[in-house]
Amino acid sequence: MKTHHTIIIAGAGGIAEAVALILAEWSTVTPTIFIGNRTLSNAQKLVKWVEEGTSRDCTIKAFHLLEEGSTEEMKQVFEQGDILLDCLPGTQAPKMAGFAKEYHMHYANLTEYVAETEQIKALAQDASTGFVLQTGLAPGYIDVLAHHLFQAFCKEFQVNKVDTLEFKVGALSKNAVAPHFYGFTWSPVGVATEYIKEAEVIRNFKKTNRPSLSERETIIIDGITYEADLTSGGAADLPDALAGKVETMDYKTLRFPGHYAWVEAQIKKECDSDKPIKALQRMMETHIPHIEEDQIILYAAVQGKDATKTLQRREVAKQILPQQVGKYQLRAIQTTTAVPLIQAAQLLLETDLKGVVLQSELDTNSFLTGNFIVPVYGEV
């Protein structure tokens, strides 16, 4: 941050941890930070962890953030806040956005949950502050990158429509073993959710839905073979924003070969379950270990014909590894999710944006060259 702000972080998990540490360590002017969590001791542990891990002087405090209702302490914290950064599970997003609106704070979140996002869009229509939604890795950075590629392609080749826009992200372990070829590097419920809920795509220039895990493909990125398949949430609002401009567009999740076949077998075993997300989560957690050393693989490409009808393609691929921040090494999933949220926060705090701001509405060039984005993602 370039000037002093008071920033409230809701949550005390791995992403909240990264957001707090990066804010303390990388801000030009260190903000005042409040950490709120339903388990106060977890918020207090995070405060101590940041204080011990940053090389900068930082004012950071914990408070008890209730799941239901509010307290006088919460009210006092919210009245001081300039922005609320929501790192809680997506089901809590409408409630957190409600607090932001009530106390005239800006708000930014990470969730890929579509229904909750629609609730917030309705709530924030007439807000006096700005609400940037779905601003993590996927949805988030990958959508801004894809939109940037689309805009650059249209400008370079003097066209206003393209054939395909594809963007893919994998939060992966460095190694993978049979039979599942996977290791959890982030929330198991998030993985299960994106495998079960439908994906929003563009087909024949129109927004539509497709079942997740229904269009598997093989792709080679930097010489390594992956599988990619449709999953929910990662496309953000691009299916709405680019309908009529892109013939075929989708977001897919990258995995090592063999993983999706294993997942499909588990889903078939639980086909009678009335709670398929919980059933798949339980099945995966029984067999798949959590992995500490991770990597993020991302790929985006746009393809279409130029003015002479020659087929052209532009693409970006990146591998992002764990990174030292202050005295700690953060996992790749932490940094890649945290910095788009922080970059969006800086945008809200240092401009006059109001109401809902979706991923397609962000200025792609300034976002992708942002002072928090570049140290993690590099230049485009």
Outline where the language-model segments fall.
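ADP-ribose/adenylate-binding Rossmann-like module
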Residues: 87-89, 99-117
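Rossmann-fold cofactor-recognition segment
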Residues: 53-69
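Conserved Rossmann-fold cofactor-binding substructure of NAD(P)-dependent oxidoreductases
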Residues: 66-79
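C-terminal catalytic/substrate-binding lobe primarily of soluble NAD(P)-dependent oxidoreductases
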Residues: 152-380
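Rossmann-fold NAD(P)-binding glycine/threonine-rich loop
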Residues: 110-131
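Conserved N-terminal Rossmann-fold NAD(P)-binding element of oxidoreductases
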Residues: 7-13
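N-terminal Rossmann-fold NAD(P) dinucleotide-binding loop
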Residues: 16-17
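Helix N-cap at the beta1-alpha1 junction of Rossmann-like dinucleotide-binding domains, i.e.
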Residues: 38-42, 114
